[in-house]
Swiss-Prot record:
Biological function: One of the components of the core complex of photosystem II (PSII). PSII is a light-driven water:plastoquinone oxidoreductase that uses light energy to abstract electrons from H(2)O, generating O(2) and a proton gradient subsequently used for ATP formation. It consists of a core antenna complex that captures photons, and an electron transfer chain that converts photonic excitation into a charge separation. This subunit is found at the monomer-monomer interface and is required for correct PSII assembly and/or dimerization.
GO biological process: photosynthesis
Major subcellular location class: plastid
Organism field: Nandina domestica (Heavenly bamboo)
HAMAP family according to UniProt: PSII_PsbL (MF_01317)
Protein name: Photosystem II reaction center protein L
Any one annotated GO CC term: photosystem II reaction center
Subunit and interaction comment: PSII is composed of 1 copy each of membrane proteins PsbA, PsbB, PsbC, PsbD, PsbE, PsbF, PsbH, PsbI, PsbJ, PsbK, PsbL, PsbM, PsbT, PsbX, PsbY, PsbZ, Psb30/Ycf12, at least 3 peripheral proteins of the oxygen-evolving complex and a large number of cofactors. It forms dimeric complexes.
Superkingdom of the source species: Eukaryota
Keywords from the UniProt entry: Chloroplast, Membrane, Photosynthesis, Photosystem II, Plastid, Reaction center, Thylakoid, Transmembrane, Transmembrane helix
Length: 40
């Protein structure tokens, strides 16, 4: 937390990485739901 002031770019990279992981998780969940819908 203390390094966020000295290096704000690092914090932005972490934020983008977190949003990317959430996006991939959302796509994965939607893919599973759609596959279950089509197979059933």
């Amino acid at each position: 937390m203390t390094q966020s002031k000295s290096n704000p770019n690092e914090q932005n990279v972490e934020l983008n990485r977190t949003s990317l992981y959430w996006g991939l998780l959302l796509i994965f969940v939607l893919a599973v739901l759609f596959s279950n819908y089509f197979f059933n």
